[in-house]
């Protein structure tokens, strides 16, 4: 029995020592990334649209926190949506497309676990804050000239009334894996919680459902 206790204690201490060896080092680091997005507009009944994203973030691995870290970044995110349907008013098929480019600042808290000296996995979540930089849309008709419009600004698809605001915010998460503490592959998803219709437009059209951004991303990163 004494021999068994000795072996058990030795195994426990060895496991703890190995776990401590794999704890990430504390301090700051930078990560640059680029990849693809699949986005949509909730409650609009539209189809998702593919886009691109790129940016950089700074991470601070907290000391004596066993893998807990804070991160903040600045991302360029391409969002949008599309749909194809029959327009009974114009008696023709219509394809609606919108592209919106946002500058986003995600602020996350995360946890990283190093499986070995070369491979680590991580997950993080938190809010994001975004501003629409540019956006455009198009109504493409089968038998009529195409109609182009600005997504942000006074000229909107429903006349000259400003309909879409530039500000957006929401919450999101990221999960991924990193190789040799340099190369990473990350999957993310963001839920917009802001109704992006302008208040005046919402008041003038009370029957409209709330319009919110949804965005999924897959990115490759490099740690500096």
Give short role names for the model-derived ranges.
Residues 20-59, 141-143, 221-224:
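Short glycine/proline- and aromatic-enriched beta-strand/turn motifs that initiate or cap beta-hairpins
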Residues 26-28, 48-52, 99-105, 119, ...:
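Residues that define the transmembrane beta-barrel architecture of outer-membrane proteins
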Residues 37-41, 77-81, 128-134, 190-196:
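Structural signature of outer-membrane beta-barrel domains
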Residues 65-68, 119, 181-187:
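Repeated loop/turn-to-beta-strand initiation elements of outer-membrane beta-barrel proteins
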Residues 75-79, 160-163, 168-224:
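Predominantly the C-terminal beta-signal and adjacent terminal strand-loop region
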């Amino acid at each position: 029995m004494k021999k068994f206790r000795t072996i058990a204690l030795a195994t426990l201490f060895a496991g703890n020592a190995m776990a401590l060896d794999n704890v990430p080092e504390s301090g700051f680091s930078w990560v640059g990334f680029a990849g693809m997005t699949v986005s949509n507009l909730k409650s609009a009944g539209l189809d998702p649209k593919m886009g691109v994203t790129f940016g950089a973030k700074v991470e601070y691995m907290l000391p004596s926190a066993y893998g807990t870290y804070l991160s903040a970044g600045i991302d360029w995110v391409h969002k949008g949506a599309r749909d194809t349907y029959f327009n009974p008013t114009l008696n023709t098929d219509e394809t609606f497309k919108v592209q919106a480019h946002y500058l986003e600042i995600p602020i996350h808290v995360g946890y990283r676990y190093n499986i070995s000296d070369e491979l680590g996995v991580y997950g993080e979540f938190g809010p994001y804050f975004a501003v629409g930089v540019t956006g455009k849309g198009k109504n493409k008709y089968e038998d009529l000239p195409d109609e182009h419009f600005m997504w942000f600004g006074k000229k909107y698809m429903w006349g000259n009334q400003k309909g879409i605001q530039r500000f957006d915010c929401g919450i999101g998460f990221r999960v991924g894996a990193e190789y040799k503490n340099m190369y990473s592959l990350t999957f993310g998803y963001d839920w917009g919680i802001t109704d992006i219709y302008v208040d005046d437009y919402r008041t003038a059209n009370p029957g409209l459902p709330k319009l919110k951004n949804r965005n999924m991303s897959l990115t490759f990163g490099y740690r500096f």
